[in-house]
Amino acid sequence: MWSVINDFLVNVDNFVWGVPLMVLIMAGGLLLTVRLGLLQIRKLPLALKWMIQNEEEAEGEISSFAALCTALSATIGTGNIVGVATAVCAGGPGALFWMVAAAFLGMATKYSEGLLAVKYRIVAPDGHSLGGPFYYIEQGMGKNWKWLAKLFAFFGVCVGLFGIGTFSQVNGIASAINGFFDPDNAHCVKILPFLGEYSWSVVIASLILTVCVAAVLIGGVKRIASVSQIVVPFMAILYFAFASILIICNITEIPAAIKVIVTAAFTPKAVTGGTVGSMFVAMQKGVARGIFSNEAGLGSAPIAAAAAQTKEPVRQGLVSMTGTFIDTIVICTLTGLSIVLTGAWQVEGLEGVEVTTYAFQQGLPFPPAVSSFVLMLCLVFFAFTTILGWDYYSERCLEYLSGGNLKHVKVYRWIYIFAVFIGPYMTVSAVWTIADIFNGLMALPNMIALFALSGVVVKETKAFFKKQS
């Protein structure tokens, strides 16, 4: 039964992430990169400066840095640790190349999303800011396109409830905790007859995680932002430090690893023994898992950007852009290099977080238990903040769909918390396939909007920097 369902999901995933969507996402990023004159290179130093510098006397609910941390809390998660591993194992080392290439173009995409979110945001009757693709589709493209805005919002709820927001994150947390405390599944319990047996560590993790998530979500966006501002920078620095140590310890192997990555991206037969189709798999998995990780083109980050305290759309666009740089070009690259350098992607029988754990155990000059513990800690907190960020995103999507009915949002919040509870009991492959499917469906209406509104982005950008000069 489960194998039939899994095969069906894989076929749907391959259809959604076929050539048309891949071309749409890459071409959209390329178009914006060209029209903005490589803005992601020219203005990156300024963007990094503004990332930590608050704007005075600006409208909004939270600071630009808090908005970025909220966005990063939703992006830096299992995608950086587990997603990279699954991409490299499925598509070969070449998947890492396409992940970084998509992220470079995605920086222009993320900039455009942040700019449009602030430009077209509105203020709700209770005073909180509302914005995102559904508003810039409706207001920027016109009322005739409201159906596209609703389609985006619907898939946004699905991604939060079944994809990035819950199942993949809590599944990753449970796998990491189980791998550290009970790797041999020696202590199992039976929850329900149809669920089978699960390690006690998985059961306890699901209970504790559910309680912690519920405690934070009840406080709304400001509590989510407060938690994210503390947790995200600290854990990102910790993970960066340990991954960097691994790279430095294997620095002599880096040229060979880069050669393998680039070669596999274009002629994967030499690496995987595949044909031309294998190159497409590398591109498919690299782009899909890259979007899972950095969310450029997905349309989620502009929902948080709309709440930022800023009066300049361009400024928030630049701050939003740094999220993709930090998430994929820095953190995912470190993870991918670690996996390739240690050969973890070639070890049979490993999947998901086990691949990255193996890489850390083999590549770091510390006892395996220490390496595993650090990775588990990073994954738990990364995934926890992602769960929080995606609840905010999906609630705003539902708020738009329901015409501002906050009663529906409150009911949804408890359904979301229940989804967190059941996530650990799903299989790794099913979790990631479902996430990929809904990501693609959510990205489609957003990318159509970015193509249509690219002229607005260029006009706003030129006007802003002309005023600054």
Which functions belong to the PLM regions below?
Residues T33, E113-Y120, P125, A243-V260, ...:
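Extracellular/periplasmic helix-exit of transmembrane alpha-helices
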Residues I5, L36-L39, G79-V84, G160-I173, ...:
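Transmembrane helix-loop junctions in multi-pass membrane proteins
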Residues L24-L31, L39-L48, V170-I177, W200-V262, ...:
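Membrane-interface loop-to-helix entry segments
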Residues G28-T33, S73, A102-G127, F134, ...:
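Helix-loop-helix module between adjacent transmembrane segments
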Residues D13-L46, C89-H128, L148, D327-L334, ...:
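Extracellular loop-to-transmembrane helix junctions
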Residues M1-T78, V88-A95, G106, F421, ...:
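N-terminal alpha-helical transmembrane segments of multi-pass membrane transport
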Residues E57-A90, L116-G140, L151-F154, C158, ...:
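Alpha-helical membrane segments and immediately flanking helix-loop junctions
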Residues L38-S64, T86-V88, G92-L96, A108-N144, ...:
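Flexible loop linkers connecting adjacent transmembrane helices
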